[in-house]
């Protein structure tokens, strides 16, 4: 409380509060020098951090573009295989219609057996093609996932320091869960 009294006493004696425009007395030069030193010494630090962040972002974007291109390529391959399957289906339908008209002209019992045999062959052919296409697409997807996982594992556990830190962090979390 005594400090406040002293402040008001000094203000009353000096005729109020005023603005000091003397640059040397106010310490403005010191502040400007300090800011200049901070900018000069900090630009390398901030520049390296920003450059590292930029390269990480560029790498992530490039990886995403690569995955998009790969997915588009696989999609176009799957669409081609689907169109081939549709062609096979239309051929089977045409053959079935032709066989049906031919069989209707012949004996009913023989026609029924022949039609059943052809139909079963067509179904098995279609299922076989469908299975081959499915297995091919499945194998391509598995291969792509394994490649991506291996690349990501190398990036994540590339340095021993990062791997140790991750292992220690996991152990600490597990210890916390057990307690």
From Swiss-Prot:
<keyword id="KW-0793">Thylakoid</keyword>
<keyword id="KW-0375">Hydrogen ion transport</keyword>
<dbReference type="GO" id="GO:0009535">
    <property type="term" value="C:chloroplast thylakoid membrane"/>
</dbReference>
<keyword id="KW-0934">Plastid</keyword>
<comment type="function">
    <text>F(1)F(0) ATP synthase produces ATP from ADP in the presence of a proton or sodium gradient. F-type ATPases consist of two structural domains, F(1) containing the extramembraneous catalytic core and F(0) containing the membrane proton channel, linked together by a central stalk and a peripheral stalk. During catalysis, ATP synthesis in the catalytic domain of F(1) is coupled via a rotary mechanism of the central stalk subunits to proton translocation.</text>
</comment>
<comment type="similarity">
    <text>Belongs to the ATPase B chain family.</text>
</comment>
<comment type="subunit">
    <text>F-type ATPases have 2 components, F(1) - the catalytic core - and F(0) - the membrane proton channel. F(1) has five subunits: alpha(3), beta(3), gamma(1), delta(1), epsilon(1). F(0) has four main subunits: a(1), b(1), b'(1) and c(10-14). The alpha and beta chains form an alternating ring which encloses part of the gamma chain. F(1) is attached to F(0) by a central stalk formed by the gamma and epsilon chains, while a peripheral stalk is formed by the delta, b and b' chains.</text>
</comment>
<dbReference type="Pfam" id="PF00430">
    <property type="entry name" value="ATP-synt_B"/>
</dbReference>
<keyword id="KW-0138">CF(0)</keyword>
<keyword id="KW-0812">Transmembrane</keyword>
<feature type="transmembrane region" description="Helical">
    <location>
        <begin position="28"/>
        <end position="46"/>
    </location>
</feature>
<keyword id="KW-0150">Chloroplast</keyword>
<keyword id="KW-0472">Membrane</keyword>
<dbReference type="GO" id="GO:0046933">
    <property type="term" value="F:proton-transporting ATP synthase activity, rotational mechanism"/>
</dbReference>
<comment type="function">
    <text>Component of the F(0) channel, it forms part of the peripheral stalk, linking F(1) to F(0).</text>
</comment>
<keyword id="KW-0813">Transport</keyword>
<keyword id="KW-0406">Ion transport</keyword>
<dbReference type="InterPro" id="IPR002146">
    <property type="entry name" value="ATP_synth_b/b'su_bac/chlpt"/>
</dbReference>
<protein>
    <recommendedName>
        <fullName>ATP synthase subunit b, chloroplastic</fullName>
    </recommendedName>
</protein>
<dbReference type="GO" id="GO:0045259">
    <property type="term" value="C:proton-transporting ATP synthase complex"/>
</dbReference>
<keyword id="KW-0066">ATP synthesis</keyword>
<keyword id="KW-1133">Transmembrane helix</keyword>
């Amino acid at each position: 409380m005594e400090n406040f009294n002293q402040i008001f006493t000094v203000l009353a004696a000096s005729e109020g509060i005023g603005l000091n425009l003397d640059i040397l007395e106010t310490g403005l030069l010191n502040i400007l020098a300090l800011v200049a030193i901070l900018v000069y010494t900090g630009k390398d630090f901030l520049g390296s951090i920003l450059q590292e962040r930029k390269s990480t972002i560029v790498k992530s974007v490039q990886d995403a573009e690569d995955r998009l291109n790969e997915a588009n390529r696989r999609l176009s391959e799957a669409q081609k295989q689907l169109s081939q399957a549709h062609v096979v289906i239309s051929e089977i339908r045409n053959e079935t219609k032709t066989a049906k008209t031919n069989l209707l002209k012949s004996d009913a019992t023989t026609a029924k057996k022949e039609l059943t045999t052809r139909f079963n062959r067509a179904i098995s052919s279609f299922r076989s093609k469908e299975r081959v296409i499915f297995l091919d697409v499945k194998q391509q997807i598995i291969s792509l996932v394994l490649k991506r996982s291996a690349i990501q594992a190398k990036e994540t556990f590339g340095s021993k320091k990062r791997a140790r830190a991750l292992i220690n962090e996991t152990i600490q979390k597990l210890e916390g869960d057990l307690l």
